[in-house]
Structure formats: structure tokens, C-alpha cells
Amino acid sequence: MKSDIDKIFESFDDNRIFKDKSILQSNYIPEEIPHREEQIKQVASILAPILRGERTSNLFLYGKTGTGKTLSIMYMKDELLKRVKKEGDFKLKIEYLNCKMKKVSDTEYRILAELIKKLGGEVPNTGLPTETVYTKFIELIDREKQFIVLILDEIDQTVKKISNDFLYNLTRLNSELSKTKLCIVGISNDLTFLDGLDPRVRSSLSEEEIVFPPYNALQLQEILSKRSLEAFKESVVQEGVIT
């Protein structure tokens, strides 16, 4: 048995396939994101006031699955955190939540509880009035001068399951905060998502919108080729495989 295990570990150490397998992971963020330069510039211009600790518009990113929405905003997350750490005189927290995850997708309470946990607080998964959870959320984030960005992926799925009120309540939080500034970044595959919102909710958003168009065939080929060159050792991926 030991010799078999040794062979497995030795084979892994002597991997002849990958230079860096992590490059193929869904959460990998490259140093450059090809064919999304314009969208990233737009995101940067909208969120740039954060660097001075100033309130910024809420932001909604739209596009079909696989168009680089989440990748682009996570890239911008790293850029903002890096700059604030170097130059800022306030704290910046950026938290990502996929609202389609089963453990949070069906109630406003569960989403708030998960956000509280991500921001370092504690709340039971069930058992409290939702209004109480909102109060705990406000108390948690308003303890000190800071800027918080909440990235809510698949936000349209949550609004459909819960109601417009969830989004309305989130966008109204800034009026109850004295020290902290809050920005919502929503990500949706549904380009008509905002059109279906209650006018009261839509007016409370004060949002900017960016649409991510689908990649064309040549762009996809370039992206895959670049990623494969970084991930695999030479000659592993034969010419013509990515076409």
C-alpha cells in the first residue's frame, strides 16, 4: 500500500502536465483581462471616488453567463483594496456573495445573516425577526469609519424569490449610517432585470449600469490559448485543440 501511495505522490510532484493548475480554477484572476478593457475602465471610473472615501453610485453589471462580469469586478476589487491599503486613511471592505447559493437564496434573513458573517459578526441562521437582523447589520458595519462594497452576484434570482423590498431595504441603509458608506454592486444575467422593479425601488438605487457583450469566437480562442499557455507545460496542448 505504501508503495502505491508513494507512486501517487511522486507522480504529483513530477507532474508533466501543469505549470500552474490554479490558473484553470474558476476563481483565478489574471493580471490582465483581454477584451474587457472598456468595461473595466467604466467600472473604475464609477468606483474611483471610493479611493477618497467618497460615496459612489450603486453599480449593476449585466451580460450573459461567461461574459466576464464577475471576473472583472473581482479584478477591480483587488485593485481598490491594493490602493486603499497603500494610500487610504480609512478601511475598505469588499465582500462577494453569490445570491443563488442554496443556503442564502430563499430568504432576506439568510442573505443578511451570511453578509454579517462575512463582515465578522454573528447571528443565528434562524429565529430572529428580519428587522432585528437589519439592526444588527447596521450596528456591525457602523462601528467605525469605513467603506463597504457588497458584490451580490445573481441578484435577480434573489429579488424574484424574495421581493423588491430586499433591494430597496439595502439601498436605504446609507441613510441610517453615520460613519460607514455602503455601495451595492449587483450582477445579473438578465438584461431586463431593473425594468421589472417597482418604481420606488428603482428610484432608490441611484445606479450606474454596464453591459458586458458576449465574446466572439476569435476572442474566446485568444482567451483560451493564453490561459492554456500559462497553465500547461509546453507541448501538452496540441496545436488545433483550441479552435
Model-derived features with residue positions:
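A short, basic N-terminal segment
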Residues: 1-57, 79-82
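Mid-core helix/loop region of P-loop NTP-binding domains shared across ATPases and GTPases
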Residues: 2-6, 12-16, 25, 56, ...
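Conserved short-loop catalytic and cofactor-binding motifs
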Residues: 31, 99, 208
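Short coil/turn segments at secondary-structure boundaries
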Residues: 34, 63-68, 102-103
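Short, charge-rich binding segments
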Residues: 50-54, 64, 82-88, 139-142, ...
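Walker A/P-loop nucleotide-binding motif
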Residues: 54-79
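Glycine/charge-rich, flexible interdomain linkers and switch-proximal surface loops
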Residues: 60, 64-65, 94-96, 100
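Post-Walker A helix-loop "phosphate-sensing" segment adjacent to the P-loop in P-loop NTPases
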Residues: 78-90, 122-123
